[in-house]
Curated annotation (Swiss-Prot):
GO terms for molecular function: (2E,6E)-farnesyl diphosphate synthase activity; metal ion binding; prenyltransferase activity. Mg(2+) 2 binds at residues 79, 85. It holds the Pfam family polyprenyl_synt. It comes from Aquifex aeolicus (strain VF5). This is Farnesyl diphosphate synthase.
Amino acid sequence: MERIETWKEKIEKRLNEILKPEGPEELIEAMKYYPLQKGKRIRPLFTVAVASALGGNEDDAITVGSGIELIHNYSLIHDDLPCMDNDVWRRGLPTCHIKFGEAMALLAGDALLTYTFEVLSQRENYKTLSCEEILEINKIIAQKAGSNGMVGGQVLDIKGYEDLYEVSVKKTGALFEACFMCGAVVAKRREKLKEMESIGRKVGLLFQMVDDYLDKDGFYEKLGECLKEEIKKLYEELKEKEIFKESQELRYLLDLIYKRIT
């Protein structure tokens, strides 16, 4: 879809614009290693699509979505570490700790996380948002990425917590909640926050279920091929939500997730 591709190009450009931290050269190189690789950018695209559907400024949504993408990439750096998933390849390239060393990768993730909030908190990076709205966006992202969100979900995962729904809602769904909620804040539609939080959670759950089906782990280990039917039910439920009916771009992004298994 042409509009999605345009947004994606703008997200790539914005990531390059905002990712200019200062510090030791090797640390900066490690911080940039994941975010500047070409990716799906599904999270910032959802942020922009929600903001657009609700009447928000697309440039501001691109800035916020790019920040969420940086948070996502910091989490990937840490997830790949030997003490977590111990992965050696990501996107066809050596993982951050393989290329830069374990200690540098750990520090790069830390620095990327803190730098993201430095960028997102600067008024000059936005066109239409008030200081109050910027503060709210930072609070939402901090909560959804933190101990009761993405990081908390990772803890449940490495501890072998059996409730896959709760693990997935926190580990994957929380950051999608942030995408949808921040889209509403950008659009100055705070009355939509609870609704967007709920929809974002379900989109994140759909994303995780599709991943598990393709990787044959997680939900697939519990449900087997029945998982495909559960995915279809959740997809059909989301399609009936008003915001998906009204936004061609949101439907397209939802289809991108679902069609990976069809």
